[in-house]
Design a protein with these regions (language model features):
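Short glycine-aspartate micro-motif
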Residues: 24-28, 149, 168
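Zn-dependent metallopeptidase/amidohydrolase metal-coordination segment
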Residues: 155-187
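Glycine-rich beta-alpha junction loops
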Residues: 33, 50, 111-118, 156, ...
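Metabolite-binding pocket within alpha/beta catalytic cores that recognizes anionic/polar moieties
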Residues: 1-88
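His/Asp/Glu-rich mid-to-C-terminal helical/loop segments that flank catalytic regions of hydrolases
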Residues: 178-204
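Active-site rim beta-loop-alpha module in soluble metabolic enzymes
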Residues: 69-142
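Polyanion-binding loop/helix "lid" in catalytic or ligand-binding cores
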Residues: 87-91, 149-154
Length: 204
C-alpha cells in the first residue's frame, strides 16, 4: 500500500511528497473461508468492515478512522486476550461499495488474521491460546452485523488506504465453509467469476 501511494504521491526523483495528492481506487480480489452456514462456497463476499487481529495498524495513528464501538464489542463478546494486542476495525469505501454491490454478493464483517495456522484456529502440533475463538467469532453480532469470513489482508488494506486517503474495497470468493465443512469444487472458476463480476461493475 505504501508503495502504491508513493507511485502517485511522491516525487521519486526528489523523494519529496507532492503538493497535490492523488486518491486511488483500490479493489482487492481474493479468496476466503466463510464462517456462516448461509454463505456457501463459490459465493462472493464484500467486506463492509475489516477486523485486524494482526496488530500491524497499531503502529500508526488510527484513532480517527477506527470503529471503536465495534472493537469494544468484539473484545467483550470474544473475551479477547489483550496480550495479543488490541483488535482494530476499519470500514470500506462507501463509494466503491455502492459501485460493486448487488443481490449477487454478500456484505459483511471480515476478520484479518496475522497468520495461517494458529491465528486462524488451525492446529498441527502447537496448542493455541484460545481454542474457542473461531466459535466466538462465528456468533459475534454487532447491531446485526455478523462476522462473515476470515482471511489475512483486508484490515490492513482498509486501514492503510484510509490513512493515505485512498478508496479501498475488499472482495472474496468463498472457497471453503467452516460452518458446513464444505469446499469449492473449482476455486479457480469462482475467482475468475468474481474478477469478471468486479470488472463489469467498475466499467459500467
Amino acid at each position: 500500500m505504501n508503495e502504491l501511494d508513493a507511485l502517485v504521491n511522491v516525487d521519486l526523483e526528489t523523494r519529496t511528497v507532492k503538493k497535490e495528492l492523488t486518491s486511488l481506487n483500490i479493489v482487492r480480489i481474493g479468496t476466503s473461508g466463510s464462517l456462516q452456514a448461509d454463505i456457501p462456497c463459490d459465493s462472493f463476499v464484500m467486506s463492509q468492515y475489516g477486523l485486524g487481529l494482526d496488530n500491524m495498524l497499531r503502529s500508526y495513528l488510527i484513532e480517527e478512522i477506527s470503529e471503536t464501538e465495534m472493537e469494544e464489542a468484539f473484545i467483550k463478546q470474544t473475551n479477547w486476550d489483550m496480550r495479543k494486542g488490541r483488535p482494530y476495525v476499519i470500514s470500506c469505501s462507501k463509494t466503491l461499495e455502492k459501485r460493486i454491490e448487488s443481490d449477487k454478493i454478500f456484505k459483511g464483517f471480515t476478520g484479518t488474521a496475522g497468520g495461517f495456522y494458529g491465528p486462524q484456529g488451525r492446529v498441527v502440533r502447537l496448542g493455541i491460546q484460545d481454542p474457542e475463538l473461531n466459535a466466538k467469532m462465528d456468533s459475534f453480532n454487532f447491531n446485526g452485523t455478523r462476522m462473515t469470513n476470515l482471511e489475512m489482508e483486508t484490515g490492513a488494506i482498509y486501514g492503510l488506504g484510509k490513512l493515505l486517503g485512498h478508496e479501498c474495497l475488499s472482495l472474496n470468493a468463498i472457497i471453503a465453509n467452516r460452518a458446513t465443512g464444505t469446499f469449492s469444487g473449482d476455486p479457480y472458476k469462482a475467482v475468475d467469476e468474481l474478477i469478471e463480476y468486479t470488472l463489469n461493475k467498475l466499467a459500467n
